[in-house]
Amino acid sequence: MEVLYSISKTLKDARDKIVEGTLYSNVSDIIQQFNQIIVTMNGNEFQTGGIGTLPIRNWTFDFGLLGTTLLNLDANYVETARTTIEYFIDFIDNVCMDEMTRESQRNGIAPQSDALRKLSGIKFKRINFDNSSEYIENWNLQNRRQRTGFVFHKPNIFPYSASFTLNRSQPLHNDLMGTMWLNAGSEIQVAGFDYSCAINAPANTQQFEHIVQLRRALTTATITILPDAERFSFPRVINSADGATTWFFNPVILRPNNVEVEFLLNGQIINTYQARFGTIIARNFDTIRLSFQLMRPPNMTPAVNALFPQAQPFQHHATVGLTLRIDSAVCESVLADSNETMLANVTAVRQEYAVPVGPVFPPGMNWTELITNYSPSREDNLQRVFTVASIRSMLIK
């Protein structure tokens, strides 16, 4: 894997900097690195593809070295260099695609394609290594079963979940009380509602709670908390739990009371925030507990009083909500996030070449299913294919 990254980094630099008119002295280091790669690769043969519709391709290396000059690089020099560079780039692209289509239930962190296994051989250790990539650094750590650490922005840590629970209901669904939520990506939105606006609740107050367990623990997280859940702020028709009917939800938004956010790790509370909104931090957690209250306003203008009558029909439904968004965090496991295209890159290649469903990844690389059942085997394979995708993205956009 280090060889693949180092070759790709050198190729990217060579493609970007070896241009007509450039002084040789300005690019001599890159040219010497590329020549080292040529010397190491010459005389070797590789084969890629042969899975799904990814075609089998054979690769042979027999290239002359790029020469030296005291002057600027001319058109002939650049054309010769480009021909060699483009062949190497095409080779790396196919090695990456081959690797991204393969998976293994055992030791999925290790190279799975014949080409990348061959590149891992001792003869290629002469290539000048560049391990500056976060993915390569963490791949090396994971390969040695040491602790890894990925920095994510808006990590897709929450499997998609959208549902509701009713603490009070009737066959007519005309006086409901309960909780509804939407968990997806890096965001939780949860709303508590009471058609009667807590008229018969103790102290005219309803208590709500929403607990979310993460599939992987996060550390040093920066989080935003807002006293609102905008996705539940407009009228909607909702299917009943048994699917036999539908019911109408017509929210009127109140501010939540006694808001408490707890971050837990292995059942132990690590951080607690009460009535704190905006930006907060959480040190280390695998569970989030949100609790909040809906309190019937003790004093209301006639217009507000008309919204919340003391008897049916309840045409407007008192609602309070919270939004929790993970803006950034560190995780030992690889995840998809908003800053990178690794999941899309891997999925696109597997779809384009009709890669059959293997023993590890779900059909279509369905992220919700993948993260819901994030086994060690999936973690190893995902880190490997994401590392390869990060290498490919340097050369192929």
UniProtKB/Swiss-Prot annotation:
Zn(2+) binds at H153. Ca(2+) binds at N266, D286. One of its GO terms (cellular component) is viral envelope. The keyword Calcium applies. One of its GO terms (molecular function) is metal ion binding. It holds the Pfam family Rota_Capsid_VP6. InterPro entries: Capsid_hemagglutn (IPR008980), Rotavirus_A/C_VP6 (IPR001385), Virus_capsid_a-hlx_vir (IPR008935). Its main location: virion. Residues 62-73 are annotated as: Interaction with the inner capsid protein VP2. It comes from the Viruses. Disulfide bonds: none annotated. It is found in: Virion. GO terms for biological process: fusion of virus membrane with host plasma membrane. Intermediate capsid protein that self assembles to form an icosahedral capsid with a T=13 symmetry, which consists of 230 trimers of VP6, with channels at each of its five-fold vertices. This capsid constitutes the middle concentric layer of the viral mature particle. The innermost VP2 capsid and the intermediate VP6 capsid remain intact following cell entry to protect the dsRNA from degradation and to prevent unfavorable antiviral responses in the host cell during all the replication cycle of the virus. Belongs to the rotavirus VP6 family. Homotrimer. Interacts with the inner capsid protein VP2. Interacts with the outer capsid glycoprotein VP7. Interacts with the outer capsid protein VP5*. This is Intermediate capsid protein VP6. It comes from Rotavirus A (strain RVA/Equine/United States/FI-14/1980/G3P4[12]) (RV-A).
